[in-house]
Amino acid sequence: MSVRKMVAIDGNEACASVAYRVSEVAVIYPITPSSTMGELSDEWSAKGLTNIWGAVPQVVEMQSEGGAAGACHGAIQTGSLGTTFTASQGLLLMIPNMYKIAGELTPFCMHVTARTLATHALSIFGDQSDVMACRQTGFAILASASVQEAHDLASVAHGASLESRIPFLHFFDGFRTSHEVNKIELMTDDDLHAMIDDDLVAAHRARALTPDTPVTRGTAQNPDTFFQAQEARNPFYDACPAIVQSYMDRLAALTGRRYGLFDYVGHPQAERVVVIMGSGAETVAETVDWLVARGEKIGVVKVRLFRPFSVDAFVAALPVSVRAIAVLDRCKESGAIGEPLYLDVVGALARAKALGLRAGIVDPAVIGGRYGLSSKEFTPAMVKAIFDELAKANPKQAFTVGIEDDVTHLSLSVDRSFRIESADIKRSVFFGLGADGTVGANKNSIKIISDSPTIHGQGYFVYDSKKSGAITISHLRFGPRPIRAPYLIDEADFIACHHFSFLDKVDVLETAAVGATLLLNSPHDKDTVWDALPRPVQQTIIDRDLKLFVIDANKVAQETGMGQRINTIMQTCFFALSGVMPRDEAIEEIKKAISKTYARKSQKVIDANFAAVDQTLSRLQSVTIPGVLTGHALPPLVSAGAPDFVRNVTAVMLAGKGDSLPVSAMPVDGTWPTETARWEKRDIAQQVCSWDADLCIQCNKCVMVCPHAALRVKAVPAEAAAALPASMNSTPYKGKDDLKGSAYVLALSPEDCTGCGICVEACPGKDKATGARSLTMHAREDVVSACKENWEIFLDLPDVARTSLRPTVKNSQFMTPLFEFSGACQGCGETPYLKLLTQMWGDRLMIANATGCSSIYGGNLPTSPYAKDANGRGPAWSNSLFEDNAEFGLGFRLALDQHRSEAKRLLGALAPQLSGVLVDGLVANAANNDEAAIAAQRERVVSLRAELGGLTGWQARALEGLADYLVEKVVWIVGGDGWAYDIGYGGLDHVISSGRNVNILVMDTEVYSNTGGQQSKSTPIGASAKFSVAGKALPKKDLGQIAMANGHVYVASIAFGASDNQTLRALSEAVSYEGPSLIIAYSHCIAHGYDLTCGLSQQKLAIETGYWPLYRFDPRKMGVGPALSLDGVQPSRPIGDYMANEGRFRIIRDADPERYAMLLEAAEENVRSRWALLRQLAGVADEQEGARAAQ
């Protein structure tokens, strides 16, 4: 028997470790927060790791979760042992197959990271809404409450499914368990083999669908038999709970860890009991233990097997003394008398009474409550509030806990000061920025510390849906025994703030305990930092007697080649200051972790990290705390000029205090105001650009490529420029068009800039003698004050009239962007396209946005980057689902066309009472897209409303409501390649086949960027991505040529960094085309594995190597010449030049040179064949054929 290991891993890895080893086929699709399980399975399969039978499982990615369920269904029908991993909307797509699998009594186990379902809004965070939507599918539902349980009960689920023939849905709470890192004991292959009966595997094989012993399954049945067939499965469900318990007992015999279908924890004569499942059960159990030790007669029943629900087992778990029960559900079922678990408990008690199982026992009162929706915190203080409510003579029959419900008044009051954590647990909190490495370093820290046989660790990481550039908060606990505290730290003895600007924005010291240590990454040294701190921070440091240490981690990172990643430096400081383990030992372990973590990068990366570690401690400084307050007052989070909603709601969320907002503050239907990102001022850039007007050639390319619209330009009247302060540069406008005589003004919003440097990369204006550019990067501190003042002045300068501008790249940047300051990554390759759409058509723009990166940086609270013009018009934006975005956008078009048609009909009906010239003009220009014509049409609508005001009758009122639809609206359906190439492709294909006038923009990053970089069918040959770590062996799907085959679809392939003129031309032609348009836009991404400052040059290289052809296919040209125009240069460089720059290709080159050479050759052939076909379609003669013909 092999020896079991103690390891620090998260819930996803704990579960996947079992699922992979007891399966033969894993069919996967990425969705947060379950994706890691699929990623690990793919990685293990690529490495040749075997299951318990010595075979390497197949891991196959599908185009959607529905596809994954279908493939699993097929695999298990033919006798394989299958599994899949999913959550939320993905689980909903699997439900039809789940009914089939259960109805066919096919053993199967799926693992779910329980997550919120999208209702009024999407949420990636955890509750049990998705699992509860599956409770009538016929799947057994087994709940795990911790990382160890996610590991153990996965084996129970797989084993019990084989014996019971009931398929299992094994779940644990998304993020709270899936992403919590904890120290657990791993089951060995021998343990797992003892949990899986080979005879049952053979029986499953014997039932396989095969022509050797043919049967028919999946028949269509009629009323004479269907009902009876449904009831025929009853004995299997009746037997299932006992089978599950037998496997739990088998696990206990192997490992010593004992589980029950319902486990009771608490006083043996408890009078008040909570019933709960999932991670919250750990919080309740910990609180119960603490309160029972202090004399309370309380307890908790942990629900493990939710389906089939065993009345006998549940009643046996309840103390006979119980007088009041609170059932907690982590979901909301609107309109129901109660939530699912509550209803089951009430029903179980009624059934038990009818069966005499509780004869002579007083019936307890049962109340139901909701908690923890969308990962809302659930703490011991809230548990105490629930037990206090149960103690009342008339407790609330239905309640919520963790929020303030000032509308329906269901919420319980909570004493926030109630705490139960032991003093021997070390608690540390780290404030970082998404993609700065803080979270990764802290995960390594837990693993390093947990390697000690006497120390246990727990880590949990708080971040929003944005993957880069948002605040992350890491919560680490260490102690001498297993830690079961699935809630955030509220009293920390170590706090690290990795970005100095956070001190002005969030209450970093809110959880600081008396005497705690504060570590700051600071540009100020020990002698100057005190005066730079906000006054409230100084006050807290003094009041709580904090120890303060500083280090300029950014400077160390730059000097050691670490760029902007400060994680290793701050991690080293933590070990030096926290005392969790000896300093020298810690540094040695950090270096081991670095070597392991970056083994797939390069030795250069490893060496840079080593250098950073070695230089850190000499740069760490202790600060002597003065007894006086010298700091500045905290600036307001939003300015006084912000709208009421922004000041009263958005600002609270920006401060990290959104939990305090009451129910009454929330929009009831999920409708939120736009134009709120301008108040956020993230202020995260280390460097910002500075402009030398004398070197500027006024091309506006820098403004065009700015991903966050932080760099703007205006051409203003000379008299306005004359009034500008000396600190604000301007220069005479150099063009010969209508703007001649104006002053050219460039300005930057430093608090909205992310410091990506792409503007400098784009700048062609240079001093020929020195090579200096018109734009250069400077330390933020050197220029921020003047920049902020100049920005406010700039905003008040007059805008150029849109109607006076020809649609050129340069002129487009004089148009105010209505997409600004998003939460996208530094150097994002998607946002310039969206910004350009809003500059060109923003006041008439309707956007249907597929779920993905663009829906997160475009619609993730607390702010919206979409803005309004001076007239209050701007993009109307909505997100439906990942899979149906094309159809959703088509719905926009159908409604717009119907509204316009009805407006025209009403115009006709009211024409005798209206001006004939007005009516004719309105009808003739209802579909016009010309800028001047739009302005004229809007004036007509104003006149129409004036005339309608003098009319009576329903038709006049109806036309008033529809009049704006006589001005053409522009529909753009936007999303990424995961949507367009995979999950939404069927809908996209149907929409472009419909012939309707919609525009589709695919921002092609060639991976599922938002879920962490998994491969899509757009991923190119030779690239390593999650779900394809060994390098993709097949070429990228050619979406453009597929669309061109329709013949009636405008299709273009664009890359703004390589040809901004072609980009603008293609977008403009798409809008002008009266039919479906598809634009495929090259979008560089952090998932490509290089510094995105070089994104523009890499785009150009993509064109030069032929990797990304630029073209436009315009059906209007058919019959008069080739409809396809090739806009890019012919391939002039080997594609290897392009691939060598990106980490996604270099990983394969460095790890497996032989395979890389094979994939490179295949990529070169793919470029040749693709270009040959494009040249043929464009009617361009092959150069070699032309040469031979000339001979």
From Swiss-Prot:
The keyword Repeat applies. Its EC number is 1.2.7.-. GO terms for biological process: electron transport chain; nitrogen fixation; response to oxidative stress; small molecule metabolic process. [4Fe-4S] cluster 2 binds at residues 706, 753, 756, 759. Keywords: 4Fe-4S, Electron transport, Iron, Iron-sulfur, Metal-binding, Nitrogen fixation, Oxidoreductase, Repeat, Transport. Residues 687-716, 744-773 form the 4Fe-4S ferredoxin-type domain. [4Fe-4S] cluster 1 binds at residues 696, 699, 702, 763. This is Pyruvate-flavodoxin oxidoreductase. It comes from Rhodospirillum rubrum (strain ATCC 11170 / ATH 1.1.1 / DSM 467 / LMG 4362 / NCIMB 8255 / S1). The lineage of its organism: Bacteria, Pseudomonadati, Pseudomonadota, Alphaproteobacteria, Rhodospirillales.
